[in-house]
C-alpha cells in the first residue's frame, strides 16, 4: 500500500515549561494572565516511546519553527489536552492566544477566560499543580 506523501500530520505538543500566572501589583486588579513556553528548543521531550531498551524523544531545532509558520496556523490552548476545553486560540496570527519565538523556544501568553475552565486553569497554575 503506497503512502500519501501529501498527507497532513497533526501533532499535539504536551510539554509546557516555565508556566505561571502573572500576578498583579499592589493596588491593581487581579490578573488572569497565564504565561509559559509551549516549546523549548534543543531540549529532549518527554519520552514519545519507551519500551524495554528502546526509547524515543523529540528535540526541536530553533530553525524548525518560525513566527511566520505559526502565523499561518490555528493554535488552541486547551485544558488537559481536551480539544473541547479551549482556553485561548490564535487563528492565522490573531486571537486571544499570544505567542513569540525567541532563542529559548516558543513562549505564549493568554488571559484565562471568565469560565469554570479558566478559573480552574488559574488555580491549578497558581498552586503549582500544572507547572510544566
Region locations from a protein language model:
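Signature of dsDNA virion morphogenesis modules
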Residues: 1-132
Amino acid at each position: 500500500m503506497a503512502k500519501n506523501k501529501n498527507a497532513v500530520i497533526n501533532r499535539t505538543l504536551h510539554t509546557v515549561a516555565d508556566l505561571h500566572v502573572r500576578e498583579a501589583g499592589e493596588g491593581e486588579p487581579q490578573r488572569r494572565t497565564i504565561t509559559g513556553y509551549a516549546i523549548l528548543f534543543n531540549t529532549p521531550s518527554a519520552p514519545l516511546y519507551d519500551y524495554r531498551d528502546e526509547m524515543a524523544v523529540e528535540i526541536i531545532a530553533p530553525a524548525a519553527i518560525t513566527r511566520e509558520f505559526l502565523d499561518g496556523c490555528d493554535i488552541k490552548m486547551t485544558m488537559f489536552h481536551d480539544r473541547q476545553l479551549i482556553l485561548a486560540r490564535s487563528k492565522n496570527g490573531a486571537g486571544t492566544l499570544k505567542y513569540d519565538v525567541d532563542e529559548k523556544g516558543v513562549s505564549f501568553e493568554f488571559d484565562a477566560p471568565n469560565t469554570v475552565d479558566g478559573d480552574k486553569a488559574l488555580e491549578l497554575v497558581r498552586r503549582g499543580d500544572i507547572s510544566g
